[in-house]
């Protein structure tokens, strides 16, 4: 089946990313609903709204960390399915809420589900992708996040045309997510498991069968055999390293470095400020004098711009220009846009100067464009690529949970308060971080992983599987069977407990 099957598989798995985008974006329009604000006796800039969004991010942090355990023990497929089932329960609770507690519990469950899927979907995609197209395949995750934002915005926009006396304004958008959640939960039963996970569990014949299904084009049998040999030898070498629990990720120098890269790329993504805009852009537009249905209409257009840009980037550019250059470009460009946004806002505090308001909307839009040309797809691709197989589940869980969702929880809680209290000065926090911390870190320390197999990336960080594998590992042909010993593949067995850290 080859490339078309791989793309279809990755796109369907990215339904989990769609739910990530939908659940992240749905509250943008829900908090515009007068019926919702009246029903829960709150305002847009209250701590209650911050709590609704921060409980979602907090749940996602927990889900991401838990996902590391389920991915390693039960597989990539199971983790995605678990997230989909939990999302379904969260959708039911939110849409049927009779009080604030039900909304908060529903948001925690939705966040938990999104946390599971946000770290498992990119890993699953990276492990089924061909090295030449991995950027595009994993980039589909960010594409579906964007589509989720689009759908949530237009579903919300349409629902807000219901009378202010109707709870349909907010119950229907919260219920809609149950449809893709159910589709994903059932559909993943028919999808194959990651071949790398199958090799790790000793299911060698099944792993080879799936590799052929994913990549065979009628002429590349030798390449598939070489890829299989490399995957198998690498995983056997890494299994020779005693790696129980989570602490080992911090004790082995190479793994610690690679984990840090994964965490930092997620932190830097959050510090662009784009998710703050995603959650609270309607508040920002209100400050610019754009109110009523015009407000949600502008938000809907905003949420279309990013995914369109992202699609163009992942199809035509990502696997050509690499990872580092787009992220450095995005850091500089987003910072300039944030500074310009703050400057215009500072001269239009009452939102009555139309020209300044238009300029403010323009720079908010440019932020999502620059983000979609850089951190949007690159952060997920880079995180999935830099993790070694032996800690890939736990490593991606930790990077997503701490780097992405813990930071998101903080900004979700404080942003509505900050936008009300310090207004335009809030944007300078993100610009300063980007220019003073993100840019030099990427320039001096991040590696270029483009066009390399997941096993070849080991060499960028000091050697294959902690330097235990020979350079010609791809040409070796380990014997089949679970009874193999490490020394039969030419691998030196090392116990981490006796290594100098």
For the regions a protein language model found, what residue spans apply to each?
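Alpha-helical transmembrane bundle of multi-pass membrane proteins
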Residues: 1-216, 223, 229, 233-501
């Amino acid at each position: 089946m080859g490339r078309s099957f791989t793309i279809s598989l990755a796109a369907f798995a990215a339904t989990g990313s769609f739910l990530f985008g939908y659940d992240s974006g749905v509250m943008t329009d829900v908090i515009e609903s007068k019926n919702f604000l009246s029903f829960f006796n709150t305002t847009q800039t209250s701590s209650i709204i911050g709590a609704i969004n921060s409980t979602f991010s907090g749940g996602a942090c927990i889900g991401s960390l838990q996902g590391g355990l389920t991915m390693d023990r039960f597989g990539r497929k199971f983790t995605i399915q678990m997230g989909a089932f939990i999302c379904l329960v969260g959708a039911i609770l939110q849409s049927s809420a009779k009080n604030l507690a039900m909304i908060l519990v529903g948001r925690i469950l939705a966040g938990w589900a999104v946390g599971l899927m946000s770290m498992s979907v990119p890993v699953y995609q990276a492990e089924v992708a061909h090295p030449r197209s991995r950027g595009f395949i994993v980039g589909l995750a960010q594409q579906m996040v964007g589509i989720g934002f689009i759908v949530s915005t237009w579903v919300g926009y349409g629902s807000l045309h219901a009378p202010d006396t109707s709870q349909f304004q907010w119950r229907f958008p919260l219920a809609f997510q149950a449809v893709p959640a159910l589709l994903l939960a059932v559909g993943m039963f028919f999808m194959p498991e990651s071949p790398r996970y199958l090799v790790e569990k000793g299911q060698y014949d099944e792993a080879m069968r799936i590799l052929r299904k994913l990549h065979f084009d009628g002429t590349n049998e030798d390449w598939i055999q070489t890829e299989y040999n490399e995957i198998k030898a690498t995983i056997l070498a890494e299994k020779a390293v005693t790696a129980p629990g989570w602490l080992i990720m911090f004790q082995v120098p190479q793994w610690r470095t690679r984990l840090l890269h994964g965490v930092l790329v997620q932190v830097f993504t959050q510090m662009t400020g784009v998710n703050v805009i995603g959650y609270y852009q309607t508040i920002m537009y209100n400050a610019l004098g754009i109110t009523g249905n015009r407000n949600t209409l502008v938000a809907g257009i905003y949420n279309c711009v990013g995914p369109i840009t992202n699609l163009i980037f992942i199809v035509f550019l990502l696997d050509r220009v690499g990872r580092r250059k787009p992220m450095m470009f995005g850091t500089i460009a987003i910072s300039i846009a944030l500074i310009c946004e703050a400057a215009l806002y500072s001269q239009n505090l009452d939102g009555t100067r139309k020209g300044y308001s238009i300029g403010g909307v323009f720079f908010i839009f440019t932020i999502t464009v620059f983000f979609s040309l850089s951190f949007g797809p690159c952060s997920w691709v880079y995180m999935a690529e830099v993790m070694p197989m032996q800690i890939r589940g736990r490593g991606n869980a930790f990077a997503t949970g701490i780097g992405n969702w813990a930071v998101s929880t903080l900004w979700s809680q404080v942003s509505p308060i900050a936008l009300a209290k310090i207004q335009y000065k809030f944007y300078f926090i993100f610009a300063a971080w980007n220019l003073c911390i993100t840019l030099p870190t990427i320039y001096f320390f991040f590696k270029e992983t483009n066009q390399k197999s997941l096993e070849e990336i080991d060499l960028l960080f000091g050697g294959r599987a902690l330097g235990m594998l020979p350079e010609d590992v791809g040409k070796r042909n380990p014997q089949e069977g679970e009874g193999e010993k490490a020394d039969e593949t030419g691998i030196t067995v090392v116990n981490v407990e006796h290594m100098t850290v």
